[in-house]
Amino acid sequence: SAASDVYKRQVCGKDKKPRQAIEKLSIDGPYLLKADDGSMRAISVDGKGRLLDKHYKSIPTTFSFEVFSDNGERLFPVTIHSVSRPKWKDVQPEKTFVLSDPHANWSCFASLLKAGKVIDADYNWIFGANQLVIIGDVFDRGVDVLPIYWLIYKLEKEAEDAGGKVTFLIGNHETMVLGNDLRYTKKKYTQLADTLGMTYPELWQKSELGHWLKTRNSIQVVGDNLFVHAGLSKEFLDRNYDIPTVNEIVSDGLFLTKKERNADKGSDLSFMFATYGPIWYRGMVRSADKYHPLDRDDLRKILEKYNVNRIFVGHTIFDDITTFYHYKVIAVNVDNQENKEKERGHGVMIEKDGSMFVVYDSGKQEPLLTE
């Protein structure tokens, strides 16, 4: 069978000399790989480390499945829904809950969504017509990548049905992993891809979640707030982009390698994935010269150009929710585990009147104070 061939290739290598026996796979998936002929392959690893590889001639319209965490906890069911690129601009709802960089840490992600009253104990959307914004970076560092993506995917549909919205923006770790830069990717993921005889990005490229990621935006405006993973630089301002163009360019390059993205030096594609592009630029929140810090006048021009009052970023990690340029830039990336344990800030709730609150894992909310 194909599976035993894969096993032989994995254990023996191409020259059939035995390699070290493979370590047991750990709970993962499902990866739903859709083919052009309408068929689907569902790949997952169960609690006993067994690879499950099911083929469906056609996809039932209400196809659903259970999602499990890496430690074997049954989390929630997901039903597949149609996927398209969200509008880049939304009207300000009553409440907008903002967080970033979950990095495959399931317990911290779920804890924060419960604290913000976004989900109930069974991971269902209870945030009504409000909006959840996640500023990138689910991949890497942790072992629960798929449960977090599947929860975001599931909540997106539930929010829509309730008149609300879920916004997931592309972070640098999405661009790294999908571009085959796996320096921070846990072994369980690369091992599964090896066992299947493909690269890890190939496993994503054909999948339902991969298709979903390719339709995500990189910059989103909600009311008078702009959200972007890392920041907007003077170089970005000088290139005079409109937001839909940025979103399209990042999507076009999402599954390309670094070499392919940089093939045409100075191109828009190359710029988006480089140091001063929106996915990597740290100069809004770092003042050392090497980061090309943004001066106040250029920030004013950026805010004017995109007709917003402030910018929220993730990417650069701080001890707590931190503000810059008198509230005009707000950094929301914190150490998820440490901030949960030490009861430090973890997310931001924006009210319709513009007031902002730091949200703690305990559910406590305190007004966000300026620097």
Where are these regions (language model features)?
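Active-site-proximal loop/helix segment associated with metal-binding centers of metalloenzymes
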Residues: 193-195, 217, 225-295, 299
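Short, small-residue-biased leader/transition segments that mark boundaries at the very start
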Residues: 2-7
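N-terminal active-site segment of His-dependent metallophosphoesterases
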Residues: 61-148
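Active-site environment of divalent metal-dependent phosphoester hydrolases
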Residues: 105-106, 140-143, 174-179, 234, ...
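Active-site neighborhood of phospho(di)ester-bond hydrolases with catalytic His/Asp-centered motifs
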Residues: 99-100, 132-136, 167-171, 228, ...
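A short acidic-Thr-Gly-centered motif at the start of a beta-strand
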Residues: 83-92, 123-126, 160-161, 218-220, ...
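Active-site neighborhood of divalent metal-dependent phosphoester bond hydrolases
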Residues: 141-227, 232-243
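Binuclear metal-dependent phosphoesterase catalytic core
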Residues: 329-371
